[in-house]
């Protein structure tokens, strides 16, 4: 079979949740979310424009990246965090149930995305192994450093401080700056 892929313009929205399927669809899912477009030189202009129009119709924000930039960026902010959440959650399966009762909301926050569709994530990971591996190796180096210096409060403080900085660097909800979003805390019993 010969398939002409000239018209195929790579791209996808950076939106979704750990849930999948039509029953979890939401009309505002792509509103104000980033939609990556990875056009190739052989793509006709009309095909790239049609892809842009699809993203704009969904009220998404377009970001154009080449394939290598895309793969590196999504490894950093999507694929690697998914695997870290899954590694953390997998360790919980070994924890005695009475100890799991001590878990607070923080553990749920860290592991929420580990409940994502396994088949989808197997495909994503297998399609982007090199950039993901770079992130995992960097984390392994960070873990080795932390393990070796865990008794040094300066190292622990440095890690926690850099963690705070990383959280502050993230954009707020739907791409807005964090100070443009108001937090409202509502207690909902589990």
Language-model features, listed with the residues they occupy:
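Alpha-helix N-cap/loop-to-helix initiation residues
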Residues: 16-18, 43-44, 132
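Internal alpha-helical scaffold of NAD(P)-dependent oxidoreductase catalytic cores
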Residues: 29-115
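A conserved regulatory-domain signal marking ACT and ACT-like small-molecule sensing domains
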Residues: 166-190
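Short amphipathic alpha-helical segments
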Residues: 31-33, 120, 180-184
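Rossmann-fold NAD(P)-binding glycine/threonine-rich loop
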Residues: 1-29
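Short N-terminal or domain-adjacent regulatory/targeting segments
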Residues: 9-15, 21, 156-171
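Interdomain hinge/lid region at the active-site interface
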Residues: 96-164, 184
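Short, flexible, solvent-exposed loop/turn segments with mixed acidic/basic and small polar residues
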Residues: 23-29, 123, 171-178
């Amino acid at each position: 079979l010969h398939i002409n892929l000239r018209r195929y313009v790579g791209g996808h929205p950076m939106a979704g949740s750990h849930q999948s399927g039509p029953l979890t669809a939401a009309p505002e899912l792509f509103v104000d979310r980033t939609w990556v477009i990875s056009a190739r030189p052989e793509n006709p202009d009309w095909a790239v424009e049609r892809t842009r129009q699809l993203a704009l119709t969904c009220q998404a924000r377009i970001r154009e990246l080449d394939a290598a930039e895309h793969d590196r960026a999504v490894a950093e902010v999507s694929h690697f965090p998914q695997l870290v959440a899954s590694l953390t959650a997998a360790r919980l399966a070994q924890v005695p149930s009475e100890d799991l009762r001590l878990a607070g909301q923080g553990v749920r926050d860290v592991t929420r995305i580990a409940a994502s569709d396994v088949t989808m994530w197997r495909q994503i990971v297998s399609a982007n192994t090199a950039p993901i591996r770079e992130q995992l190796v960097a984390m392994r180096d960070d873990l080795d450093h932390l393990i070796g210096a865990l008794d040094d409060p300066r190292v622990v403080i440095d890690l926690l401080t850099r963690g705070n900085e990383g959280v502050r660097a993230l954009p707020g909800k739907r791409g807005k700056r964090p100070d443009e979003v108001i937090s409202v805390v509502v207690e909902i019993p589990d």
